């Protein structure tokens, strides 16, 4: 009897495997020769099935592999059966530039990429353009120019805490792992502005469960996207089998912690000394002033504001150290402009031409979000090609902004290309550069809401460090760019820098405030 049951089971299994093989073969033939996107070039595995995207997305090498594809196949490459990657400046405007969400040519977000769960969306994950528009409208006052002026002191306080640590530890033989310190800094800033609370990660020089979750969740994020693409119906089972108990526990604690921080922020109400992202909602007694909204938006803002800003500051530090002339010019501008580090703030750094050029060049050569932001075509022209309705398409930011056709010496770091024509360091060899090929924060109605905050934070931090210290890379073997991996977001490699105090530059005097280290 058992023998017969075993035979029956094997027979069923054989039939399932056979049908699976037939399905793969038949669908591959369709995708290769009859699919609406079959005319676009790309690797065989990418055109036939989703295997290429899945493999590259979890390998960490996505930006470099996509760059190689465009070098081989051209502006528009088929990276999946129903997915295209574009590396032309015009595609940025065509895909992301339509401001009217009701316009027939509006490209909607690709749900599978953005929506990780069935829970309500946030400013970063909501796919319905009307709901997203409402969320953005309610959050916008917290990111306005007026709000930034009130938030500047908060940002400076955390940056001064970093300077204090650098003045104490920067001269040691091993230097400081700035990938780690920049992440702690960005985390402290964004948590303070999201939940009105100082965690003091930089001040104590130690991480916590929350930031460790952010730093180590990249593979799970990448794997989650791959699973949703291919096995959406079985995603819970696959997640159960592949995600370990520690990761599940960290995620549960992360969500619980965010809700607790949201509850505490609600309890403090609008009568707080500092201005954060949710202050206006509390003052208005808005319906959005609730735990669900604060926790959902706050966790997205913390994740996005920590990873992208910190990794970019590490990359910019790396490129400046690799290009001593650029670092010298930056320091000369800063030390000529300021007599004391306390003069350096968000407003005073806006007019510094070389500083802002260096930041723009860093954004170009090492985009904070290098993956394409996938959209669903409504049936429209993109870069002169008709993209059928329902097709997935994105501009490959990392590729487009590093293309030799759009930027002279595109793989090299040259802030001079962003300088005004009358600047003494401007070089006419960059006069034909297409600046519109570099849009690190995207454009249109769904561009990054925190763009001005990010620029302000980077301006102040880089300025204070470059004004106060002379920099030295500790190890020539550390290649920050080569060693970086993309897993959901950039996973920064360790990068050690030694800092020597500049003569006459005094470190900031810290007023140690009460630090809340209870991470629920």
Swiss-Prot record:
Cofactor section: heme
EC category name: oxidoreductase
Segments traversing the membrane: 2-22
Bilayer topology annotation: Single-pass membrane protein
PROSITE patterns, A to Z: CYTOCHROME_P450
CDD domains listed in its UniProt record: CYP60B-like
EC number per UniProt: 1.-.-.-
Domain of life of the native organism: Eukaryota
Pfam families referenced in this protein's UniProt entry, alphabetically: p450
PANTHER family: CYTOCHROME P450 (PTHR24305), CYTOCHROME P450 MONOOXYGENASE ASQL-RELATED (PTHR24305:SF210)
Function: Cytochrome P4590 monooxygenase part of the gene cluster that mediates the biosynthesis of betaestacins. The bifunctional terpene synthase btcA converts isopentenyl diphosphate (IPP) and dimethylallyl diphosphate (DMAPP) into the sesterterpene betaestacin I. The C-terminal prenyltransferase (PT) domain of btcA catalyzes formation of GFPP, whereas the N-terminal terpene cyclase (TC) domain catalyzes the cyclization of GFPP into betaestacin I.
Protein name: Cytochrome P450 monooxygenase btcC
Gene responsible for this protein: btcC
């Amino acid at each position: 009897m058992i023998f017969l049951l075993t035979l029956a089971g094997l027979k069923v299994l054989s039939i399932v495997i056979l049908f699976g093989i037939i399905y793969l073969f038949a669908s591959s033939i369709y995708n290769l020769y009859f699919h609406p996107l079959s005319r676009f070039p790309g690797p065989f595995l990418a055109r036939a099935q989703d295997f290429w995207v899945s493999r590259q997305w979890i390998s960490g090498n996505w930006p470099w592999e996509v760059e190689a594809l465009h070098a081989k196949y051209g502006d528009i490459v088929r990276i999946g059966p129903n997915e295209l990657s574009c590396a032309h400046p015009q595609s940025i405007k065509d895909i992301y530039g339509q401001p009217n969400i009701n316009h027939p040519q509006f490209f909607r977000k690709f749900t599978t990429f953005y929506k990780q769960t069935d829970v309500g969306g946030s400013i970063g994950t909501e796919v319905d353009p009307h709901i997203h528009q409402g969320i953005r409208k309610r959050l916008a006052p917290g990111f306005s120019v007026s709000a930034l002026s009130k938030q500047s002191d908060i940002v400076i306080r955390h940056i001064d805490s970093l300077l204090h640590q650098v003045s104490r530890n920067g001269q040691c033989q091993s230097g400081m792992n700035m990938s780690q310190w920049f992440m702690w800094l960005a985390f402290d800033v964004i948590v303070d502005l999201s939940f009105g609370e100082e965690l003091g990660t930089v001040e104590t020089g130690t991480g916590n469960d929350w930031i460790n979750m952010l730093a180590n969740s990249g593979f799970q994020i990448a794997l989650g996207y791959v699973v949703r693409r291919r096995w959406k119906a079985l995603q819970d089972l696959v997640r159960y089998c592949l995600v370990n108990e520690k990761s599940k526990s960290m995620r549960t604690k992360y969500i619980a912690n965010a809700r607790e921080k949201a509850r505490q922020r609600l309890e403090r109400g609008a009568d707080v000394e500092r201005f954060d992202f949710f202050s206006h909602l509390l003052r208005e007694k808005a319906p959005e002033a609730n735990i669900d909204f604060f926790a959902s938006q706050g966790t997205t803002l913390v994740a996005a504001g920590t990873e992208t800003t910190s990794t970019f500051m590490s990359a910019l530090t790396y490129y400046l150290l690799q290009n001593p002339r650029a670092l010298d010019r930056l320091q000369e501008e800063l030390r000529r402009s300021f007599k004391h580090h306390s003069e350096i703030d968000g407003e005073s750094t806006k007019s510094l031409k070389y500083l802002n050029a260096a930041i723009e060049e860093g954004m170009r050569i090492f985009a904070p979000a290098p993956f394409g932001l996938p959209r669903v075509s409504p049936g429209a022209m993109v870069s002169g090609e008709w993209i059928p309705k329902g097709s997935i398409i994105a501009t490959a930011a990392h590729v487009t902004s590093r293309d030799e056709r759009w930027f002279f010496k595109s793989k090299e770091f040259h802030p001079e290309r962003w300088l005004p024509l009358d600047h003494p360091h401007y070089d006419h060899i960059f006069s034909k550069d297409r600046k519109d090929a570099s849009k690190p924060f995207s454009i249109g109605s769904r561009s990054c809401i925190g763009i001005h905050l990010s620029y302000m934070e980077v301006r102040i931090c880089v300025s204070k460090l470059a004004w106060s210290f002379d920099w030295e890379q500790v190890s020539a073997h550390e290649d920050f760019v080569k060693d970086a991996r993309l897993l959901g977001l950039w996973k920064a490699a360790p990068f050690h820098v030694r800092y020597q105090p500049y003569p006459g530059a005094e470190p900031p005097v810290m007023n140690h405030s009460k630090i809340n280290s209870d991470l629920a």
